[in-house]
UniProtKB/Swiss-Prot annotation:
This is Crossover junction endodeoxyribonuclease RuvC. It comes from Trichormus variabilis (strain ATCC 29413 / PCC 7937) (Anabaena variabilis). The lineage of its organism: Bacteria, Bacillati, Cyanobacteriota, Cyanophyceae, Nostocales. The keyword Glycosyltransferase does not apply. One of its GO terms (biological process) is DNA repair. Keywords: Cytoplasm, DNA damage, DNA recombination, DNA repair, DNA-binding, Endonuclease, Hydrolase, Magnesium, Metal-binding, Nuclease.
Amino acid sequence: MEKRILGLDPGLAILGFGAITCTPGLTQLQSTKVNILDFGVIKTSADIEIGQRLCTLFDDLHTVIDNLQPDVVAIEKLFFYRMSSTIVVAQARGVVMLALAQHHLPYVEFTPAQVKLALTGYGNADKSEVQEAVARELDLAEIPQPDDAADALAVALTAWYQM
């Protein structure tokens, strides 16, 4: 049975999303087919008041969810050294959680280290190694752009590996 997984890389300026479809083999020995359903970003302008930016994220994420109809959502967990960055991304994550709750969607969360480990086998891999692994796993000639969308696909793949 096909599963749709929506990966999200939350941010206020740019929220990356990447959706995959996964069709398991009939037995554990058979390979699993994983395909890209869609990927992209939701952007908000720094020129707009933060409340309006959060509304834009919320509305646009609803549209993405309605269009892609995921079975489960995978979200990258917060990990920042600067408090100001953490607060802004936490606000965006709150909007994400509200949208998921309104759609009654289950979600899983992964730290950046968990995503790196799942895709490269090494929890301290750099961003380019993870993005190359995404392209390889999804049989793409090029790394998906922008980076936030590639990161969201990495989170979706991590969820699939954990199922």
